[in-house]
Amino acid sequence: MQRNGLIGDTIRSLGFLSRLPLPQGWFDNTDDSLPRNARAFPLAGGILGLLAGVALLIANAISLPPLAAALIAIGALAAMTGALHEDGLGDTADGFFGASTPDRRLDIMKDSRIGTFAALTLVIWTGVKASLLMAIIARAGAGYALLALIGTEAASRAGMLAFWHALPSARPGGLADSMGQPQWETVVCGCGLGLALLAIGFLPSGGMVALINALVLMTVVLFGFARLCMAKIGGRTGDTLGAAQQIGSLAALIGLVMAL
């Protein structure tokens, strides 16, 4: 089996994006360049969405209320990823709205302590995402909520990949800058995979309207967030990549719920 192929890239992407136990052999003697492996980010996201969806299905099967099932799915995602993207969202909120200069914003984003803006953002974000999953369960069923999680987690990581490619590093020499930047071919491949999984996740319940809604909303909000990043800190950091994923996932879910 080609360990530098798409399967290998998916496993190595899971190794970066999650804390799932993975075979070490897939990481030995391979081209493990993150910008190259990143084409498989949407596939890794789809796997994480599938596992979170299974948790939601189990919660629904044992007659837990939709709110509990939705929160369990959100918690499962955070547990599997080590809250990697949620941490980025919180740090971005603290930095962007807790300081008045780019350098000070970047300093705050590096601080591991959680501030008021981060706390409020994460509470509101979790509540909105849970309410959207509840709406999908109520209007279409838990099985379609599972499909929605697959599509959402895949497409949001494709959006994160495009965001990573489009913006310059805001902190030259920092950790995110040292990881490099994906090439255009990687972005095209990743976005194609993300679109395919989004279609699989959304078409059965919401049809083409849901798919178009999600694509338009994701494009608009990620473009707006990219402009905000340039205005606030002059580019991207690892935290803003995580925030982009969270923003994209919520936009996609809103697009689906609008169509149900």
Curated annotation (Swiss-Prot):
Compartment list: Cell inner membrane
Gene Ontology annotations for the cellular component aspect, listed alphabetically: plasma membrane
Cofactor(s) of this protein: Mg(2+)
Alphabetized Pfam families for the sequence: CobS
TM ranges: 42-62, 64-84, 117-137, 144-164, 192-212, 214-234, 240-260
Pathway terms, separated by semicolons: Cofactor biosynthesis; adenosylcobalamin biosynthesis; adenosylcobalamin from cob(II)yrinate a,c-diamide: step 7/7
Reactions listed under catalytic activity: alpha-ribazole + adenosylcob(III)inamide-GDP = adenosylcob(III)alamin + GMP + H(+); alpha-ribazole 5'-phosphate + adenosylcob(III)inamide-GDP = adenosylcob(III)alamin 5'-phosphate + GMP + H(+)
Domain of life: Bacteria
GO process terms (BP): cobalamin biosynthetic process
EC number(s) reported in the record: 2.7.8.26
NCBIfam families hit by this protein: cobS, PRK00235.1-2
Protein name per Swiss-Prot or TrEMBL: Adenosylcobinamide-GDP ribazoletransferase
Gene expressing this chain: cobS
